[in-house]
Each structure stands twice: as C-alpha cells, then as structure tokens.
C-alpha cells in the first residue's frame, strides 16, 4: 500500500471522543476538501475525498456532532482522474453547518483561512485540524532525498493558518506556492515522524521509518561499494571517527552545548557518511564546508576542555583502532 493511502486509512479509523476535537476536524476537512456553493438560492456544503473512509468519517461526524444529514456520492475515475472520488454534500442545512463550523463568519462571509475557534483552540484541536487537512488533501512520499509530507490548500490564507497550527505543535512547516497551487510542506524526517505520531498514525510511522532506515543503509552500502579511491575511503573513515567524537562530546557537555554547535553536531551524528560539504548543504541556513567544520571543531575542543576539568575521558577516547587504521 502506498504511504499516503496507508496514512489516510489509519487516520480515518482513529477514535476521537472529545467534541471540540471532532468539531476542529470537521471544520478542517470541509475547508481543505470542500467549498460552499449557491444552488437555487441555498448554500450547499460539499467536500471531495479520494477515499471512501474519509468521506464516511466526515458524514458520521456531521451527523453526530451537528445533527445534520449529508449524502455521499461516488464519482468514477476518468482519463484525468484515475481513482474514484467521494463527495460529501449537505443540502438541507448547508448554511447552518457552514456557520456552525466557522466556514462563514457572523456576517455570512466566507472565511478564507481556518475558523478562529480552530486557530486559537487547544493542542488537541491543532492535532485534529491537521488530521482533517491530511485526510482532505494530504500526501506522504516515500523516504528519500525528496521525501515530504504535504497538504494542498485552497488558498494562501488556509496554508498560512495550517503552518501556524503546526507551529503550536512544535513542528516546522513551510507554505509554498508551486505552479499556482498553495501547499504546506514538511521535509524534515524527524518532523514528519513527530506529526504522524501526534495524528495517531503509529502503524504508518513504523512502516515509513523502516523504509527510511532501509534506504539509508542501502545508500551507505552503495557509497562504500563505489569508493574506488583510497582518499574517499579515508574521508569516510574520518567522518565516522568525527561522528564518534561528536557523540562523546554531546555526552560530556549535556545541556551546556550552545545551540549552533549542537545543530552542527546533530547533523554529523545523523549523517555519519556525509562529507563536510554535504553537511553544510543540509544545515538550515546552508553553511560552507569551512563553517560547518569550524563549528564541529569548537564543539570537540569545548568538550575536551570540560573533560579535562572533570578528570574524565575526552572525545578521542571514543575512537576505535578501525577508525584510526591507515589504508593498507
């Protein structure tokens, strides 16, 4: 099963009991998957999904939380859209639902971002809003160089609102316009894992992390297999040795590590085979090879000085004979 489909299937079956969370999820699903239409002078609420489970979840929540009936219509795929689409439509009480969910403000005007009750709600409401947005128009690509969790948004206001909701959860997301389409994107692997955990997609997270780990191991093996140059092998060994020293430095300093040095050290630990130039490219903002090397040197020097003061083994104590061996 593709990652997006797996996540949506799991989220659609997640049990949510708090009314405030169910309201936030409904509002988000309607905002990101739907719209308001005027039919014969009446406001009709519609939302379109690519899974029947998401459509049925929305219909159930609308009925149980707001007491309104809705219809679910399946539209078969055609040449442009291969998969079937599921449309949830509220005709009779469309205007009432639009006002109750905050899609219309007190003056009857459409809300372009997310409803104020969702934006200013609690942490559980923020989680529910993201769950609804992902069920509506989310995608998760396979782990790799371009892996990302994305949500396609109805407009820039909704995108910025979703970024703000992510920030409340401690997750860094970016709003981007690509070929006229507004998207919210999360690229950092750890942030993706954190969000999937908060949303309740635990099985999907395990599958994604397993594929991510498998890819990293395969990439490392491929790089080592292609090392037909002794200098490259020495560079790889030096990178691994630096990683071991950084790990010991973090252990020695604990909470005393300055943030900018901690970030450089974390990059070295997370990408043990990467060159200094590659580490600089991974840093946010991007750093030169010399800048990232300087930060790692300062981290090691700071840790060695602290180790000497405490009378404990320094960072070089973490090196093994294999790391120090020369090419034969």
UniProtKB/Swiss-Prot annotation:
What does the function comment of this entry state?
Answer: Involved in cell division and chromosome segregation.
Write down the PANTHER family for this protein, in alphabetical order. Answer: CELL DIVISION PROTEIN WHIA-RELATED
Q: So what family is this one in? A: Belongs to the WhiA family.
Name of this chain's protein: Probable cell division protein WhiA
- State the DNA-binding region(s): 275-308
A GO biological-process term: cell division
Record's keyword terms, sorted: Cell cycle, Cell division, DNA-binding
Entry's Gene Ontology molecular function annotations:
DNA binding
**Organism encoding this protein:** Nocardioides sp. (strain ATCC BAA-499 / JS614)
Q: Which Pfam families match?
A: HTH_WhiA (PF02650), LAGLIDADG_WhiA (PF14527), WhiA_N (PF10298)
């Amino acid at each position: 099963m593709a990652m997006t489909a797996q996540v949506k299937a799991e989220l659609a079956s997640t049990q949510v009991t708090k009314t405030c969370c169910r309201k936030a999820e409904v509002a988000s699903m309607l905002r990101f998957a739907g719209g308001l239409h005027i039919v014969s002078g009446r406001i009709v609420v519609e939302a379109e999904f690519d899974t029947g489970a998401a459509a049925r979840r929305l219909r159930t929540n609308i009925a149980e939380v707001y007491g309104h009936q809705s219809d679910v219509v399946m539209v078969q795929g055609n040449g442009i859209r291969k998969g079937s689409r599921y449309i949830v439509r509220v005709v009779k009480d469309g205007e009432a639902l639009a006002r109750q969910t905050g899609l219309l403000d007190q003056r009857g005007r459409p809300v372009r971002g997310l409803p104020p009750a969702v934006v200013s709600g609690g942490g559980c409401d923020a989680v529910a809003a993201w769950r609804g947005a992902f069920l509506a128009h989310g995608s998760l690509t396979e782990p790799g160089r371009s892996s990302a969790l994305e949500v396609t948004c109805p407009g820039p206001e909704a995108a910025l609102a979703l970024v703000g909701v992510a920030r409340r959860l401690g997750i860094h997301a970016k709003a981007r316009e690509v070929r006229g389409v507004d998207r919210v994107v999360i690229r950092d692997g750890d942030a993706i894992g954190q969000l999937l955990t908060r949303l309740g997609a635990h099985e999907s997270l395990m599958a994604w992390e397993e594929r991510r780990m498998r890819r990293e191991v395969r990439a490392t093996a491929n790089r080592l297999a292609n090392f037909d140059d002794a200098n490259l092998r020495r560079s790889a060994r030096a990178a691994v040795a630096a990683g071991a020293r950084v790990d010991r430095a973090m252990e020695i300093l604990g909470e005393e590590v300055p943030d900018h040095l901690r970030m450089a050290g974390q990059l070295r630990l997370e990408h043990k085979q990467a060159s200094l130039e590659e580490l600089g490219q991974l840093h946010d903002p991007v750093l030169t090879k010399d800048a990232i090397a300087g930060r790692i040197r300062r981290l090691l020097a700071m840790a060695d000085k602290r180790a000497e003061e405490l009378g404990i083994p320094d960072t070089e104590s973490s090196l093994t004979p294999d790391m120090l061996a020369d090419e034969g």
